Amino acid sequence: MCIRDSFYDRLTLNISYKDRAEYFDRLIKLHGGRKNLLLDLACGTGSLSEEFAKMGYDVIATDSSQEMLNCALDKKFESGLPIQYLCQDMTELDMFGTIDVTICALDSLNHLSSKEDMQKAINKVSLFCEPGGLFIFDVNTPYKHKNILAENTYVYDLDDVYCVWQNSFAGTPDSRVNITLDIFERDDDGRFTRYGEEFSEIAFEKSVMEEMIKASGMTVEAVYDYDTLDPARTDSEKLVFVAKKPLV
């Protein structure tokens, strides 16, 4: 278990998963996707999976962290929604059949360790994608890593949890940012317990991402500036890619 698993929901309270699901649903309809079997890849604690299930999708959700999935299963118990959760690394995805739509949200692909692993993950999605099916994902851009995360430090004060997020831009070909988290959780006696963790995120230019999609056997349908239907810009901090598996 990584410490992010324990604090994930509290540190992402600013995210409206309902809005995220509605945005992805809009893209699915716009690009001719079927409202049928949907895979939520790297689903985390299942908040987005829950929203897709409420919208009528038949949802399968995977994550490499059993701790995250335990939180997701707690939500499933409360909601009663028929979501199937599987503990799988996205580079080793293994489905029982083909999937109509795969969603990978909240820059999950950026958390992979290398370009090779990113290609493996995209290849796996393509392998299990129904012909005519879609793969929609968002990623942080090299621009964001170089100019926004860069060498900056961010602080999150959430009453019972205090988080210091420190970035170090490595300047490597994969625009790697090394991230250090220091999380302080308030105990019942008012004192704080400190937890620490280090991890990295990688990012690639739009053209490189498009090459990886094409190498998997899928086509690039569109690339949008994050959370819009606007085209990608050179200063986009996040991009949304829509890929499709050809019918033949």
Task: Tell what function each PLM region has.
Residues 119-131:
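A short glycine-rich, Lys/Arg-flanked "PGG" loop and its adjoining helix->strand segment in the class I
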